[in-house]
Amino acid sequence: RLLYVALCLALIFLHLLPLETLPRGWAGPDVMLALTFAWLLRRPDYVPPLLIAAVFLLADLLFQRPPGLWAAIVLLGNQALRAREPGLRDLTFAVEWLSVATTLFVMMLGYRVILALMMVDQAPLGLSLMQVIATLLVYPLVAIVSKAVFGVRKIAPGDIDALGSRT
């Protein structure tokens, strides 16, 4: 859990660094969200809901987004994936990726609808779609790095979770 928080804080820090002085014409991936999804679908006990909410609320505050809105939507998306995780455990990576893609698109649409209802200025739809697609393209890489570097693999029957109980 501490590693997840450290990685998220490092990603937030890298996002806040002023590496470019001109605004970009494209939207990069949300690596923190891809990391959260990858770890959630492999070891849900490593990313409890309150930890996800706290990390994304901090990101909302630091990135000057509407406080708590994206954090709440991420939490809802994570809970939807958490409910499907036992069924996805034995299926292929393509099914997992499709499930993540569906969740990401629904989250993005929900975020945009709520911002529109509240009459808040938002990024063009093209940039939002570009970010979702970029996040989906980086997701396999995040999943591979999570397994190869950090040892976060899918739960097998009989594994012991972080709380000491068998799965």
Regions found by a protein language model. Give the residues of each.
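Terminal, non-globular segments
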Residues: R1-T167
